[in-house]
């Protein structure tokens, strides 16, 4: 056996030290500058966004809608950190209260609607001043910054007994993911001139989740004009086909865009990376 001071012993000691240090070096490596953000559509206007840092955002979580991929989703999602509600209508508030009670998710919406949802059972300690705001405000949600932006619609909230409550102003959401994409969820809205300002304020929008159904919101032709204002890389249509009245289709959107943007129709329940 070589002595501790021999060259062979010193080389062996160095090799062992290098092997021991290797896992530490690997774990200290920074994450990629642009990680994978997963977007899952659950039908209608309901989406779940999972960031590279593991933050989970549920947007307009009507998870029991007719286009949902399976029943009982509000009781099955393993983790939700924040629930974003664009306005007070039942098809956007959806299962927010039940989901919040089960997951502990904090509420991001306007202050008036937030107060009404707390009265309806949303846990008060999950709907505080740190996450309730109004149009123009930005909320830090883990590794995502959520800015509330203009939408033209209504926002009355009715509880389970049909009693009307304040719903504040309707809104869309611009979600800037650290190390990931910038997403724009239009909420329910008509075409607005404010959309022209989004690229100036937020830079390139990577993914625009846009209503196209018509009747209550933009139809495909109006949505195509909105896409021209926002200039996203990818357009994901939503809020169509759930009811007979919202009859706009992705095919009509593609035709109206004339190849000016990629239209990507998501399959309910299937995550897609951006």
From Swiss-Prot:
Q: Does the keyword Hydrolase apply?
A: yes
Q: What keywords are annotated for this sequence in UniProt? A: Hydrolase
**Can you provide one Gene Ontology molecular function annotated for this UniProt record?**
hydrolase activity
Q: Spell out the Pfam families in the cross-references.
A: Lactamase_B_3
- Source organism's superkingdom? Bacteria
Supply the InterPro entries for this chain: Metallo-B-lactamas, RibonucZ/Hydroxyglut_hydro, UPF0173, UPF0173_UPF0282_UlaG_hydrolase
Assigned protein family: Belongs to the UPF0173 family.
- Database matches in NCBIfam families: PRK00685.1 (NF001911)
Among HAMAP family, the record links this protein to:
UPF0173
What is the recorded name of this protein? UPF0173 metal-dependent hydrolase A2cp1_1196
Q: Give the source species.
A: Anaeromyxobacter dehalogenans (strain 2CP-1 / ATCC BAA-258)
């Amino acid at each position: 056996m070589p002595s501790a001071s021999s060259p062979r012993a010193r080389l062996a000691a160095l090799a062992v030290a290098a092997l021991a240090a290797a896992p530490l070096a690997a774990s200290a490596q920074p994450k990629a500058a642009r990680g994978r953000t997963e977007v899952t559509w659950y039908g209608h206007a309901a989406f779940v966004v999972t960031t590279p840092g593991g933050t989970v955002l549920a947007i307009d979580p009507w998870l029991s809608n007719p286009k949902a991929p399976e029943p009982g989703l509000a009781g099955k999602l393993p983790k939700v950190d924040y629930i974003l509600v664009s306005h007070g209508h039942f098809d956007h508030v959806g299962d927010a209260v039940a989901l919040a009670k089960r997951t502990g998710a904090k509420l991001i919406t306007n202050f008036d609607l937030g107060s009404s949802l707390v009265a309806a059972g949303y846990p008060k300690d999950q709907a505080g001043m740190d996450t309730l705001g109004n149009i123009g405000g930005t909320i830090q949600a883990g590794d995502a910054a959520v800015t509330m932006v203009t939408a033209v619609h209504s926002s009355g909230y009715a509880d389970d007994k049909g009693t009307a409550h304040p719903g504040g102003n309707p809104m869309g959401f611009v979600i800037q993911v650290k190390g990931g994409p910038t997403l724009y969820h239009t909420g329910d809205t008509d075409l607005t001139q404010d959309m022209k300002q989004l690229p100036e304020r937020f830079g390139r929008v990577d993914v625009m989740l846009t209503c196209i159904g018509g009747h209550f919101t933009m139809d495909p032709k109006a949505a195509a004009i909105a896409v021209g204002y926002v200039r996203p890389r990818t357009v994901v249509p939503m809020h169509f086909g759930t009811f007979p009245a919202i009859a706009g289709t992705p095919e009509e959107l593609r035709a109206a865009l004339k190849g000016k943007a990629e239209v990507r129709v998501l399959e309910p329940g299937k995550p897609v990376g951006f």
